[in-house]
């Protein structure tokens, strides 16, 4: 009987180690839906055109123990678009840049041989900038949006399911507490053959609040 129990425990441990990461393992995963797919409550603090910190999320984890992982999150979203008209002749170029960074810890529970549920906490910060350049026969105007900065923390709940050794699919939800501040806007107009004139706003703003959000929708990841 004792031998049978020991054999069962050994097989179970081998099955878990075949799929799940152990102490010293490194994982990385990528968001399949960067802005979430189940959002019912959007963050009251937007970062650029994105709510919360969901811009192009990539996450890495280092397992300090079999069930404790240090996590690092990085979000990037850069875009540029140009519109042209012929009557009158104008060209408008819009650019935006969003960057986010997070650092936290996860505690993983036993689950099953393939399923790894976890809870965690994370601190994050981010920034967003944007501008528009408009060119016509009369003048060139460059307008810079007010830069936005956000910082805060998350309480996290998620699960990873290992579809094959060292390959997993997962989902993660989070309760966010965040604060954002907004800088000044500016606009520079240069008439054709003239001198540039710059106007800058004098005011700044800030906001904060709670939001519930499936931060990264589904994700796919790998264990190294």
Map each language-model feature to its residues:
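Short glycine/proline- and aromatic-enriched beta-strand/turn motifs that initiate or cap beta-hairpins
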Residues: 14-79, 83-84, 130, 208-224
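Transmembrane beta-strands of outer-membrane beta-barrel proteins
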Residues: 24-30, 70-72, 99-101, 117-123, ...
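Outer-membrane beta-barrel translocator domains and adjoining extracellular loop/strand segments
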Residues: 38-47, 51, 81-94, 128-141, ...
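Short sequence motifs at beta-strands and strand-loop junctions characteristic
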Residues: 49-53, 93-100, 111, 145-152, ...
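Outer-membrane beta-barrel architecture
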Residues: 59, 104-106, 154-158, 219
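Residue-level signature of outer-membrane beta-barrel architecture
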Residues: 62, 107-109, 159-161, 177, ...
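Outer-membrane beta-barrel channels and translocator barrels
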Residues: 65-67, 110-114, 162-164
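Predominantly the C-terminal beta-signal and adjacent terminal strand-loop region
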Residues: 163-224
